[in-house]
Amino acid sequence: MLQITKQRTTTPKAKPDEGNLGFGVHYTDHMLIIDHDEEKGWHDARIVPYQPLELDPAAMVFHYAMESFEGLKAYRTPDGSIQLFRPDKNAQRMINTNHRMCLPSLPVEDFVQAVKAIVEFDQDWVPHAEGTSLYIRPFVIATEPHLGVRTSRTHKFIIVCSPVGAYYSTGINPVKIFEDEYTRACPGGTGFTKCGGNYAASLISQVKAHELGYEQTLWLDGVEHKYVEEVGSMNCFFKIDGTVYTAPTVGTVLPGVTRMSCIEILKKWGIPVSEERLPIADVMKASHDGKLEEVFGTGTAAVISPVGELRYEGDVAHINNGEIGEITHKLYNTLTGIQWGKLPDDMGWTVKI
């Protein structure tokens, strides 16, 4: 169990307008930091006023992308209490990421304790407005000043928090996606991790998508370039002739917490779910045959993002007449209902602060 010291700020910030929060724009009064080195392991856990970090310019994180991160939220329920959604899954995923990136990891229970501690300390920053939440960003960075390519001897685990607005400020609406020539991940790589390099390398395709009038990129596998894997920075699902398909998490696909939750809910509802590899050709054929019923992405930020149009090699699939699908909508309402405490948590997923 962590021994966390706490220092409250003497200059608290003014709270932002909950009707105009945006995403990742505002930050709470405090942050959590835990140091790590080879001799002491994790030590000096502390909550301090939010402030810039002081790092050596040669810190290895700047030169070799030696870092990892997570993303989860705290939700204000109708009775005013605060809860988290499956934080243990984020903790385990960070352990898996850190193993791949040669970074040290907090045990699951310490990760969850740290998250609960900073949220409780800054609980006044958890917004009350409909659809808002407190986004929580834990991350690990290599801090040793060294330009040789090897593992770092010193690290920091840090959590910052940001009150965020409703992702769909005008309602949940389908987006348009397209497939591009770029590759997100290959077998043996870091596709299953949450490391910054994965996201930086995806931006060029995102820019191209926007230039062509599309919101997101559909990522295919990096070997044969024929199997669907992710959409943008989300997991993706395809409902074809009554069955819901999503890519297997076998090394190139991020094991999303929302993805996992959707699969469990769908199975509870008795809807067939396949985690077999799905060729993009089969998706387009299903569209032409009138069997492509719904497409949606899943992730912490948006929860569920419906897709209304998919472009592949000049061919365009129009999904459900550009309207949100029945299962997509039901999943969104169910997940957000559990997260914000408006529906009973029969799955045991929420953790009270």
Residue map of PLM features:
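Extended Lys/Arg-rich, glycine-bearing segments that form polyanion-binding/interaction patches
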Residues: 20, 87-91, 95, 99-212, ...
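Short, Gly/Pro- and small/polar-rich lid/capping loops
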Residues: 1-49
